[in-house]
A protein has these predicted regions:
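FAD-binding core of flavoproteins
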Residues: 1-79, 89, 179-185
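Active-site lining segments that contact anionic ligands and/or coordinate catalytic metals
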Residues: 25, 45, 57, 96, ...
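Residue-level signature of the cytosolic catalytic core of signaling kinases
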Residues: 43-44, 93, 124, 161
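Alpha-helical transition-metal enzyme core signature, strongest for iron centers
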Residues: 67, 71-74, 101-111, 115, ...
């Protein structure tokens, strides 16, 4: 455990990374940073195992965030499909509009089941690595599918700031590559 007030300038440098999403991101540079033995958390030599276990929790939390995003996109798309009238009827009466939203809903709910499985394993102290990775993968894919369905449902209006779709679209894309890329799971 390191007190940043003491470490910054004494071997630790924090460099912000500018980005377009609502997540503060920084690079950390360690250069001969001395850490007292009293700062040790857990058993010496087991730090990597602790990190991996922490990543399981992180991936499960990211899965939950993706599921929330996916549900937001589905609700936004569904509401717009009900309200937007073209040629005298709501666009949601067209199967071509309905099916991508319904498919995204199915994918989000399936990802949520895997997320709960990972949470339960983690809470019981079991190895949740595989379930956490599957939950993160499925949820990232599901939220991205929901984002695409939502943007497609809104058409050109999906890029208008007033609908918030374009902002969330950019944010949910992040989880295809972070905290671990879906093609590395």
């Amino acid at each position: 455990l390191v007190d940043l007030r003491e470490a910054i300038g004494n071997g630790l440098t924090v460099q912000p990374i500018a980005n377009m999403v609502n997540h503060e991101t920084n690079e950390l540079f360690f250069d001969n940073l001395e850490i007292p033995a009293s700062s040790l958390i857990g058993e010496e030599g087991k730090g990597f195992r602790y990190i991996l276990d922490g990543l399981n929790a992180e991936r499960t939390l990211i899965a939950a965030e993706c599921i929330g995003d996916g549900r937001w996109f589905i609700e936004k798309a569904s509401a717009y499909a009900r309200d937007r009238v073209v040629f005298g009827r709501p666009i949601g009466q067209n199967q071509g509009v309905q099916f991508p939203i319904a498919k995204a809903h199915i994918e989000v709910e399936a990802a949520d089941l895997m997320r709960w499985r990972a949470c339960e394993q983690y809470d019981r102290g079991e190895n949740a690595g595989a379930s956490a990775n599957m939950a993160k993968y499925l949820a990232a894919e599901a939220s991205w599918a929901a984002a695409n369905a939502c943007l497609q449902t809104h058409g050109g209006f999906g890029f208008a700031n007033e609908y918030d779709v374009e902002r969330k679209f950019r944010e949910t894309r992040l989880y295809q590559v972070a905290p671990i890329s879906t093609n590395l799971i």
